[in-house]
Amino acid sequence: MKRHKICKIIFAILAVFLCVAFYELIGICITYKKHPAVSDATIKETQNIMSVAGRENTERAVIIEKNSQALLERVRLIQNAKDEIILSTFAFKSDESGKLILGALHDAADRGVHVRILVDGMESWIDMEGNPYFYGLSSHENVEIKLYNKANPLKPWKTMGRMHDKYLIADGKIYILGGRNTYNYFLGDFPGHKNFDRDVLVVCDEPQKDNSVNQLWNYFETIWEQEDCRYFHNSKKLADRQSVKKAVLELQEGYQQYFEVNKEKICDTDYADETFETEKIILLSNPIHTQAKEPVVWYQLGELMKNAKERVKIHTPYIICNDMMYNTWEEIAQKVPDFSIMTNSVANNGNPFGAADYAKNRNRILETGIDIWEYEGGYSYHGKSILIDDDLSVIGSFNMDMRSTYLDTELMLVIRSKEINKQLEDGMMEYESVSRQVLDDGTYYDPYHVKPIELTEKRKRKVFLVQHLLGWARDLF
């Protein structure tokens, strides 16, 4: 009798779990499996964007390639801010680099700087809830933290709409934008796993109405005020907790140590010798609602690439495309003589979903006419950039996959500048020198004599399972 009762309880728990899973699955599929088309308004807007791409510009820029430099430049912006700091990030952890950023932000707030932070509501649920380091910042009188689309299992129709933006603005005059999240994988040179990515720093001493810094600031204000963004634990009473006091003290001491070691560089506010002139900088963005999105950024990037005269070079960590996306690449390949893409090899890809889909669809990608280079550097490459001819560069958060195309908020910065283009080309080539070109027959062209990463049996099994169990959801990962 007792055993029978236990079986009934287990069965009831399992039934509830399956019902919840079915509810979540139905809500997600109904909302996100249908992909919106490009609107006439986007087509018209894209034509206008291209027509003003060469107008006079007062902004200067430089690309940030190394993770150690990326951390230092963020601290530098925060330390020298006088009035306002805006930080938007997909993921924010309280590891070594995350604590340094938290410490720098807390120090700025102590100086009277108004700090606003926006974090994706799924990642924050994992990394920030119950965390005294984040409570120490959110309870500060000069700090506001909001979460975009906070995770809610009762609303599966909003689950997949994530905020993937990554940028930092100081005083409405200088910003960093790119693909780096706010933790050790991307910032600093700490032991352990790393992801290689890329940012661009933009400076404008006297911003004008249509400068990119104002485009980005206006974008932030719009998303900050929308109803899907809710405050994160802003009670001032949190500061009285012993765990929070201890965390704040640790942040202050850790930041002061980092500041003293790097003081000369951090306090340098003259960017003139470090940056390059630009003719025009344009911000491309996806819709900011949480439903399935019109593929605005994908379309605009495609049109920019179709207008290339000689070359287009794409770097992306993942390639997960549908027919519309493949068709775009086919059109580019027909128009542009030199069209290539570099992505992680199956063995080198840190994302099992990206690795599995690429392994299955590599031949379909080759059929578009694009040349594929596989990165074999040992650490997963996370850079999201496009090089067009000798004067146009595109850097940001957009992956060449269906999630970036239809589900996430995304930002890409388009920069017209021969100097930035050359800097981007040099940065790309550093990674391409550890890559091999995939040939149509499945063999490789290996001009750099690269030793490929071993595809282990464990990775093979993982790829197989993802392909066969989750392939139906390839547009959701």
What do the PLM-derived regions correspond to, one by one?
Residues 2-143, 153-164, 170-477:
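Charged, low-complexity intrinsically disordered terminal segments
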Residues 146:
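Phosphate-binding P-loop/Walker A region and its immediate neighborhood
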Residues 150:
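Short loop/turn segments at beta-alpha junctions that line or gate ligand-sensing/allosteric surfaces
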